[in-house]
Amino acid sequence: MSRTLLRFLEDGAMSDVTVVAGDSTFLGHKVILSLHSDYFYRLFNGDFTSPDTVTLDATDDAVRTVFTYMYAGCDGLNDRTIDDLQSIIVLADYLGITKLVDECVRRIVSKVDVLNCVGVYTFAETYHITDLQRAAKTFLTELLGSKEAFEELSQDDAVIALRETRNIVDRRSILRAILLWVRKCPDRIEQLKVLVAAVDDVDDDDNVYTIYERYAEELKDMIACPLSYNCVVVVDRDRYVRLINPDTLWSKRVTYIRKRAIGDRFTVVCMNNVLYCLGGTLDGAPTCDVLAYDLLTNEYSLMPEMGHYRRNASACIVNGYIYVVGGVDEENRLIGSVEYWQPGMEEWHDAPYLQANVETATVCYRNELWIVGGTVDLYHPTFISAVKKLTDNRWMSMEPLPEPRSGATTVVYNNRLYCIGGRIHGGAYTNHVYNYLDESRTWERVGDMANVRRNPSCCVYNKAIYVLGGNTNAVEKYNGWKWQEVGNISTYPACNNTAYPFFYTNDEI
């Protein structure tokens, strides 16, 4: 049947419409074009006389590809260049052929690399193709770390790469990329302010030479941070701090967290290569202890105690501070207090109170503390869908989750906030994953995990989300398109665990 329809297109037999594209003419059939294209359906089925000739502003190659798709269902996209695919997307989008657009997007994603990611990102941004934009953006951070690729960029492309990654990578990577680009050609120094403006760091009173010298001096004093990592830090099933490469499943135990130092139901966060174990139970009673373990020096130390006894608390790092939220106190009551502390401070300080809760998800999103869902009644388990952020020392309500949820994990990936897993109505564990859309202030459900999880650990590791633990040993990876199981790693269930990307300098990996 497909060959028969294609022959009608090739021969023009029984055609009733002529489509003109440049110097080329195509003989088509209104019923077939209307079947596949929203544009042609409206054009040929209105209350006015249907035209016999249609002119399209597209290349004849793009029109031929789109027509072949409509008549034969074969897309002929395998050997197409990115430029070809972009031309087809523009035409297919104009004609309202969504499936062909999606297929072209998938083909482009498979071809994106550091050499073409800026052009792909610009195209996706222009035509509002969100999925393609996200995929291209994952390569922009890698582009900043590639000396050869970044210094060859035009000024406009360098500005795009810097602008879109300035809130994702560290300042050292930004400064290094800017200086590398300027040093490539002597006359580029005059364009320095344009690049600096892309990262919102411009001072009108400074000339380009002053800015260059300041950046060079600042870069000298910075500790090098890797643009990529080779392992993830977790607390494993037997309470060892373990380094794991999720791709190869290489692992190494580096220390044991003894129960006489800290009991169970503690909360783990990591900042600047130091693990912090917060609260928990010791001899069955909640504590306010804070134990630090330095991954680089292999040393333990006690930090200032929290102001409240708490177990099963939630915590995260925000702008260099550790924030601890909720939990259960020594009288088995839910806690509404929020505390914060940073290394060097002699004591913890109180942040504004919240509704008493436990198993709320915490995350640093756009340099602010966000809390998502949680449990507000232990004896008659009651989950909430509330989402709040701490802005100017007060809590602001954001768009709630589509359904009440407790014990989820949250992570920022490609500048987007994700809420993963947890418990929903009736206490059932879930594999649902939601993405927060800033533009519309709504939550969008994306691909589900293969496994249901409560209180999993999660981190972004080398351009993908990795989820570990949460009542299963299965490790899953999300690349922005789909979830994939990559192995099995056991994590310690009697704590609110962490998963922290890390660069291990030993040659064992």
From Swiss-Prot:
SMART domains, sorted: BTB, Kelch
Q: Tell me which residues make up the BTB domain.
A: 15-79
Source species of the chain? Myxoma virus (strain Lausanne)
Fetch the InterPro entries from UniProt: BACK, BTB/POZ_dom, Kelch-typ_b-propeller, Kelch_1, SKP1/BTB/POZ_sf, Vaccinia_A55R
Pfam families reported in the protein's UniProt record:
BACK (PF07707), BTB (PF00651), Kelch_1 (PF01344)
User: Is this entry keyworded Repeat?
Assistant: yes
Keywords (alphabetical) are:
Kelch repeat, Repeat
Domain of life the protein comes from: Viruses
Presence of the UniProt keyword Iron-sulfur in the record: no
The Kelch repeat ranges on this chain:
274-320, 321-368, 370-415, 416-463, 465-509
Q: What is this protein called?
A: Kelch repeat protein M-T9
Q: Which PANTHER family match?
A: KELCH PROTEIN (PTHR24412), RING FINGER DOMAIN AND KELCH REPEAT-CONTAINING PROTEIN DDB_G0271372 (PTHR24412:SF489)
UniProt-listed CDD domains: BTB_POZ_ZBTB_KLHL-like
Q: Which family does it belong to?
A: Belongs to the poxviruses Kelch family.
